[in-house]
Amino acid sequence: MIVGKVLDMDEKTAIIMTDDFAFLNVVRTSEMAVGKKVKVLDSDIIKPKNSLRRYLPVAAVAACFVIVLSFVLMFINGNTARKNIYAYVGIDINPSIELWINYNNKIAEAKALNGDAETVLEGLELKEKTVAEAVNEIVQKSMELGFISREKENIILISTACDLKAGEGSENKDVQNKIGQLFDDVNKAVSDLKNSGITTRILNLTLEERESSKEENISMGRYAVYLKAKEQNVNLTIDEIKDADLLELIAKVGIDNENVPEDIVTEDKDNLDAINTGPAESAVPEVTETLPATSTPGRTEGNTATGSVDSTPALSKNETPGKTETPGRTFNTPAKSSLGQSSTPKPVSPVQTATATKGIGTLTPRNSPTPVIPSTGIQWIDQANERINEIRKRNVQIKVVDSSNKPIENAYVEAVLTNHAFGFGTAITRRAMYDSNYTKFIKDHFNWAVFENESKWYTNEPSMGIITYDDADYLYEFCRSNGIKVRGHCIFWEAEEWQPAWVRSLDPFTLRFAVDNRLNSAVGHFKGKFEHWDVNNEMIHGNFFKSRLGESIWPYMFNRAREIDPNAKYFVNNNITTLKEADDCVALVNWLRSQGVRVDGVGVHGHFGDSVDRNLLKGILDKLSVLNLPIWITEYDSVTPDEYRRADNLENLYRTAFSHPSVEGIVMWGFWERVHWRGRDASIVNDNWTLNEAGRRFESLMNEWTTRAYGSTDGSGSFGFRGFYGTYRITVTVPGKGKYNYTLNLNRGSGTLQTTYRIP
């Protein structure tokens, strides 16, 4: 949907000016009038008239008049409406919403601060409702949309800002009383949330601090956390706080009741343990951070590729809980699945064991004060594994207690990683979705995806004004329904040969018009859906737009995309297989930054021939890491008829990238022989759905980089393990009471993550 003001009309068409001062020729509708603000669809845009260029000077004058008129009306209407606003209540889940409160302590307006919030607020009528009523409706809608799940830990940050002088000169003299009533209402909302098993935190801000949050384009609540972090000398930037997981953020900063008025209590201090909803249901555990002990944390886990345990038998007192299994390095073909290929969980379901430890603290090996990581006998792999253990894992300490907070000994605990924090992805294509083997392989092996061609300009708009997203929408819905995150590739492509044919023939004036339309259409269509966008593919190798529209078009593409969808992350994306190309990419990002562009990440293509030089790759990653940005291998493949060499190439890239601290994801550019753009010699899955050697190597790595820990609690009710970052399913079996299921989010952080599960 595009919003703009009508500047001129004839019998069939109208010219509108959008909020970013783009001029569009659109189909006229009956409700249009010159000067009126209207909404039009992408499909309403028609090819620009020849007269549009001549019209621009007149349009500019009209635009100035419309802008001045708009400011006058906005000033009059805005002042009238806002005189009755005296307080603001912020709600941060991941959707961030701000409620404007009038003197009646009712909602005057609900503002969406991000795309997720727009989705939540759609269809909700919150005006004239109390804060408690509004919070309840927002939470219910967030549950329906999956932003809040009873199967995982949830926390809601509520922030307030009140105008203590708002009542001066008005009929409402008792502002302090109004504020007291407002906090009573907030308390009721908090109480309702607590009864639902949702943890809350409340923070107060001044109006000046609220204004500062608006200037920084961050919610009140997250800005309050930023101020708290500064106060406690916690090194977090505003950008990091904008994007951080709330649960991890609050634990790291240590948000408690210090900023909360005395009459607002967010949690029962005598009941900070997990809220259990009963056997076989999810509960919300208490999560706290501890600093590492002075001794070296133990690494008591071992990896195996033999599968997972299907049952949770109770252990006798004579058995050793959490026995460690340490297999050797093998690449034998795993058991065959019904598809004929090896059956492996999503890069998300490993096999690991851990030893239960005494007390709560960092994990310590039973028999050794030094870290133990099994050696493969291959030096570069051992070195990579040391780095992986350091940067991709964290210690966890689970404590199981009864309703009286007494530790439960010999409770059987199983922790299984169900979704890896690291991105393991693939390019997918609509033309293969007919095959159930294809879709099953995606669901079983990947947590990220990118569309091979379906979100590129030449696919979305093959002829000027003929726009379609049908194939992309189909792929997105498949990913969404299977919990797979999506990278957007790409808004533009700087190489001339990859432009739509009609774009190559445009003069600069019309091309500039087309660039705006593409931004509005593509980014607007996928707003709130794509996690990442590659803004302009291959900027260090092409100059189609730059040569025709000037170098300023590059910053404009990034900045305008962010205006349309401020919640996506915007990447540069280039083929980088040499150190020179890495230097060129660093120079490009630094130039964009000098032009006021915020670049969120660096995408690296890796389309290799018959070899992958791991030392060269590490050198490239080291050069790019000086930018202090997340790095993604966005397109990987290697073409060679020797499938064993192809397997070695795959491991060289995956293990080198996974062991580099700046890399956050790896996306292979297809996997199945039949639809791979480079054919059989680049695939990991044969046409008949058997794995070739490269596929077996891939599955072996995925098994190696997953975690399954199991064992029994000790006398203090404790069980510990070290696992990869990600989401875990925790199952606690208590003899005589049954089985209890929980969800644990193991995020990056210092020290041991401690959590307590209370068994009723």
Curated annotation (Swiss-Prot):
Enzyme class at the top of the EC tree: hydrolase
Residues exposed to the Cytoplasmic side: 1-55
Active site positions: 538, 635
Protein location: Cell membrane
GO CC field: plasma membrane
Lineage: superkingdom: Bacteria
Stretches the record annotates as Disordered: 274-352
UniProt topological domain (Extracellular) ranges: 77-760
Xref: InterPro entries: Anti-sigma_RsgI_N, GH10, GH10_dom, Glycoside_hydrolase_SF, RsgI_M
A GO molecular function held by the record: endo-1,4-beta-xylanase activity
Biased composition range(s): Polar residues: 291-352
Domain RsgI N-terminal anti-sigma: 2-49
Reaction it catalyzes: Endohydrolysis of (1->4)-beta-D-xylosidic linkages in xylans
Keyword Membrane: yes
A Pfam entry, by short name: RsgI_N
Keyword entries, A-Z: Carbohydrate metabolism, Cell membrane, Glycosidase, Hydrolase, Membrane, Polysaccharide degradation, Transmembrane, Transmembrane helix, Xylan degradation
Catalytic activity, EC: 3.2.1.8
PANTHER family: ENDO-1,4-BETA-XYLANASE 1, GLYCOSYL HYDROLASE
Subunit and interaction comment: Interacts (via RsgI N-terminal anti-sigma domain) with SigI6.
Free-text comment on this protein's domains from its UniProt entry: The GH10 domain binds to xylan.
Function, as annotated: Anti-sigma factor for SigI6. Negatively regulates SigI6 activity through direct interaction. Binding of the polysaccharide substrate to the extracellular C-terminal sensing domain of RsgI6 may induce a conformational change in its N-terminal cytoplasmic region, leading to the release and activation of SigI6. Binds to and hydrolyzes insoluble and soluble xylan substrates. Has low enzymatic activity.
Family: In the C-terminal section; belongs to the glycosyl hydrolase 10 (cellulase F) family.
Record-given protein name: Anti-sigma-I factor RsgI6
Organism phylogeny: Bacteria, Bacillati, Bacillota, Clostridia, Eubacteriales
